[in-house]
């Protein structure tokens, strides 16, 4: 399912707030990460990514030349990362081998992984249906500090109370269902 106009507008505003945090982005080539929760149906994930990239590119010159780290969140034990051109993501070629995986996931492990391996990214987008859980609230809050929480934008279909409690720093945009 594609993002609506209101969600795209909120996303652009969230991106602007993240990039204008003092000390975050100072110009030049932007390095960003896009986490795709593989519990999303392939068609929905592809449409959402294409819509997001189109909106970002039309929004600002900053997104014309980007180092895009794509993180495929398949399960707690399987988090794959690859660097892909935004044009390839916009065309949808990385989704040719996409497999939907419905498993119980904990955001704790994803946040730990992002803190370790995506610390250089100035913007992190998480696309998910929001069906993940929080195993350890303390670990999540620790992973979000000092910078990760200020760089994350969560694009979710639904938000549970435990996920909402994490949003002290990370911004959440609920998609139309």
What are the functions of these language-model segments?
Residues 1-127, 131-135, 150, 154-162, ...:
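Von Willebrand factor
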Residues 19, 138-139:
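Alpha-helical scaffolding within the catalytic cores
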Residues 23, 59-61, 115, 143-144:
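Beta-strand elements of modular eukaryotic interaction domains
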Residues 45-47, 135-138:
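Conserved ATPase-coupling elements of RecA-like P-loop NTPase cores
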Residues 52-59, 139-148:
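Catalytic-core regions built around general acid/base machinery
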Residues 117, 141-177:
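Von Willebrand factor type A / integrin I
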């Amino acid at each position: 399912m594609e993002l609506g106009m209101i969600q795209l507008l909120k996303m652009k505003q969230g991106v602007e707030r993240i990039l204008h945090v003092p000390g975050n982005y100072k110009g030049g080539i932007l390095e960003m990460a896009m986490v795709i929760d593989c519990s999303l149906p392939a068609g929905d994930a592809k449409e959402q990514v294409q819509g997001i990239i189109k909106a970002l590119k039309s929004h600002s010159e900053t997104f014309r030349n980007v180092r895009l780290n794509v993180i495929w969140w398949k399960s707690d034990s399987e988090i794959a990362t690859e660097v892909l051109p935004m044009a390839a993501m916009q065309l949808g070629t990385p989704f040719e081998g996409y497999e939907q995986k419905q498993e119980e996931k904990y955001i704790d492990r994803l946040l730990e992984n992002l803190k370790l391996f995506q610390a250089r990214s100035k913007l992190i987008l998480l696309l998910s249906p929001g069906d993940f859980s929080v195993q350890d609230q303390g670990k999540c809050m620790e992973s979000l500090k000092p910078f990760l929480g200020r760089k994350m934008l969560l694009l979710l279909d639904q938000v549970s109370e435990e996920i909402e409690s994490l949003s002290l720093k990370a911004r959440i945009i609920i998609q139309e269902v």
